[in-house]
Structures are given as structure tokens and as C-alpha cells.
């Protein structure tokens, strides 16, 4: 194949994939080294739609809400680049004879086929212009019931950002009205949303799994594997957990019982939209967990941090974990881990604190303490918020 002729005035956006963009035309260079590698795709709401009416029970549809991940893989077949989705995974490492047969049984789903337009020294060039407008992968369509939207009326790409480990596609999308659902009480509203979709390279080496036990109350994901010498696929469950590993240089110290810092710490960032007076309590809620990690041999394993006001710290960067304040009448909070279902590894998390959670906390406190406190002061509210966020962490 010949090198495609790119316009001299095209904007070049470096990153996981090099992007060439001129006007509305967008080309990607898929590196040969990334063919066959697995990637995660997450969708984040950057600006939610304003609605005249919204149910107090609506959990999703706010700035910062993240959905996914979906596991995708690029492959080259018959002079085409094929995008596939991995929807199931069976660990065949214990079976030396049936692994290939099982791979056929668990065949990935083909999502898109791209003509190879040309090549660079390290990769193949494909046109993704129309594909990036498709709301089935780059929009909210797969999550429409959760946020109460109809079919997509219009969508356009507004920006593409690149990092060495990811590419972020930002878009504006308009959705038709939908009849009343549990997610919304609004009827007849056409809504506009700003989204960020992050395609991120997953680690080459899978994390070692930890099988679940009914005696220990961890959250889990389904897992299938084959044992050596067996022809049976065993259905099991593995624990959702962070990849906390001892650095090679600290192995001896760790085995002697000394506290060591993990190779990669857990960092959870507080969104700058979080009200300033509550920030100290939220930071403490995260950092309180260090005492528990020390019992596993790790010091400074987790840190709550205020998000810096810099370009790389955005809500749609799926490498980052966030605590976000939601202007919602819902009296609650929630924490969602985003998990690699192949191993149970937590890739990132999103913790939401709804504004009206303070109504619930006030009611709880008064119901349990009666008139022992004369006023529900900010300092008391902050300590109760710290309890809630610690629970979600």
C-alpha cells in the first residue's frame, strides 16, 4: 500500500493513535504494535442536559457520570482493520489442549470494518470520520434507559485529545424525547449533551485473580476458567480489587514485615466543582483508609487529592478516579468501580455525592440523637459527610 496523501494543513494530534484532522475529516493511524491489544472504552458526561422536570430518584444524567468499560480490540484481517468487542473471557491457561477450541467458542463480536487507506512506518491509516459520529459506541444510546433519552437526532465530534496511553473523543449529541421512565419524569423534552469517550490501552499482563469466598464480603465479577487436565469450563467469581503490587526493590523488606509503598498508588481526585467548605472532610474520608492498607503491608497506598487546574485532569480521562458533587435532589451518594471483567482489576472509580444527601444525614442524626444537639452546624455536617464518603470509598 502507498502512503496516503495527507493535506499539508491537516492538524496532527499525537497520542495512542496519531490523529490527522482537516475540517470534519478524521484519520487515525493504528500502530502495528497495538493490533491484538485490549483497550477499555468509557463514556463520561461532561455537561448534562437541563430539564424542566427530573425525578428525585434519577441517579444518572449529571456531569461526571461515567459508563463502561467496554473491552475492545483492533485486528488486521484481509487487508482491513477490524474492531472487535470482547464480551466474555475464559482463562484457558490451565488447559493445553482445548484453549484454541474455547477461543473459537468465545469469539469476539465484530463492531466495525475499516478499509486500509495507506500506511506509515509503524501503522495503518483508516478513516474514522463517520464512525466517530455513531452514537451506539460514542454516545449515550447504550445507556438510554438509565438517563431517560430517546433515539439520537444529531451528533458531531467537537475535539480529539491524545495521551501516550489513550485517545479521548469529545462530542455534542442531541436526543429525542422519550416517554416517562424510572430515570426521568420529563415528557416531550429534546435534550443536548456534551460527552467524552476515552479509549485507553489496558496493561499487557493481566492481574492475578483472587477467587471469591462466601466467608469474605468482597464485591465480585463472574469468572470462567479451565483447570489442568480438565475439559470442563468452571464458572466461578473473582474479587474486584485494585492492582496493589510490591515493587521489585521492596520485595525483601515487604517479606520481612516492613511497610512499603505500592508500585502504583490509588489516587482519587476531588473535582474542583465540589463546594470548598466540604473539601477537607472529603479528603480525610479517602485518606482514612491508609490505616487499613497498612494491615496489608502498604503505607501511603491511597491518597485523596484536589484535582489540579491543568489540561490532563479531566473527568473524561478514564485513567483518573473522581469524587464529584451532583446538583441533585437525590438524598444519597454512590461509588462505582470500573472493572476489567477478565481479572476483576479496578481500573478507576467514580464517587458521586448528591447535594440533598445532607437532608438525609440531618434526618438520620436527629432521629438517633434527639435533642442532644441544638443545631445542625457545618462542622457536624462535615463529619457526617466524611462518614458517607468513607463508606463509598
Which residues make up each language-model segment?
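Stable alpha-helical elements in mature extracytoplasmic
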Residues: 278-285, 381, 385, 389
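A short alpha-helix/helix-coil micro-patch that ends at or immediately precedes a cysteine
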Residues: 281-299
Amino acid at each position: 500500500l502507498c502512503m496516503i496523501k495527507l493535506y499539508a494543513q491537516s492538524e496532527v494530534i499525537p497520542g495512542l493513535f496519531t490523529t490527522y484532522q482537516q475540517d470534519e475529516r478524521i484519520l487515525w493511524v493504528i500502530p502495528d504494535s497495538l493490533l491484538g491489544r485490549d483497550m477499555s472504552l468509557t463514556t463520561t458526561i461532561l455537561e448534562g442536559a437541563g430539564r424542566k422536570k427530573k425525578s428525585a430518584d434519577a441517579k444518572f444524567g449529571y456531569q461526571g457520570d461515567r459508563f463502561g468499560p467496554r473491552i475492545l480490540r483492533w485486528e488486521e484481517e484481509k487487508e482491513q482493520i477490524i474492531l472487535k468487542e470482547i464480551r466474555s473471557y475464559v482463562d484457558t491457561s490451565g488447559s493445553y489442549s482445548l484453549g484454541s477450541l474455547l477461543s473459537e467458542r468465545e469469539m469476539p463480536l465484530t463492531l466495525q470494518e475499516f478499509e486500509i487507506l495507506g500506511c506509515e512506518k509503524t501503522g495503518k491509516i483508516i478513516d474514522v470520520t463517520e464512525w466517530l459520529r455513531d452514537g451506539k459506541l460514542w454516545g449515550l444510546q447504550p445507556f438510554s434507559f438509565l438517563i431517560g433519552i430517546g433515539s439520537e437526532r444529531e451528533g458531531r465530534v467537537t475535539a480529539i485529545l491524545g495521551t501516550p496511553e489513550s485517545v479521548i473523543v469529545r462530542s455534542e449529541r442531541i436526543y429525542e424525547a422519550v416517554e416517562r421512565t424510572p430515570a426521568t419524569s420529563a415528557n416531550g423534552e429534546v435534550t443536548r449533551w456534551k460527552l467524552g469517550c476515552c479509549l485507553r490501552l489496558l496493561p499487557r499482563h493481566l492481574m492475578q485473580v483472587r477467587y471469591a469466598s462466601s466467608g469474605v464480603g468482597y464485591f465480585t465479577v463472574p469468572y470462567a476458567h479451565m483447570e489442568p487436565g480438565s475439559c470442563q469450563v468452571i464458572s466461578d467469581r473473582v474479587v474486584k480489587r485494585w492492582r496493589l503490587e510490591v515493587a521489585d526493590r521492596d520485595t525483601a523488606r515487604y517479606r520481612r514485615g516492613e511497610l512499603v509503598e505500592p508500585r502504583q498508588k490509588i489516587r482519587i481526585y476531588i473535582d474542583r466543582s465540589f463546594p470548598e467548605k466540604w473539601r477537607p472532610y472529603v479528603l480525610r474520608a479517602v485518606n482514612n483508609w491508609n490505616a487499613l492498607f497498612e494491615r496489608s503491608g502498604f503505607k501511603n497506598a491511597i491518597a485523596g487529592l484536589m484535582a489540579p487546574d491543568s489540561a490532563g485532569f479531566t473527568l473524561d480521562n478514564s485513567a483518573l478516579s473522581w469524587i464529584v458533587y451532583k446538583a441533585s435532589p437525590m438524598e444519597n451518594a454512590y461509588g462505582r468501580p470500573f472493572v476489567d471483567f477478565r481479572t476483576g482489576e479496578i481500573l478507576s472509580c467514580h464517587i458521586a455525592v448528591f447535594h440533598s444527601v445532607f437532608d438525609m444525614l440531618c434526618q438520620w442524626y436527629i432521629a438517633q440523637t434527639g435533642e442532644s444537639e441544638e443545631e445542625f452546624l457545618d462542622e457536624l455536617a462535615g463529619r457526617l459527610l466524611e462518614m458517607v464518603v468513607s463508606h463509598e470509598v
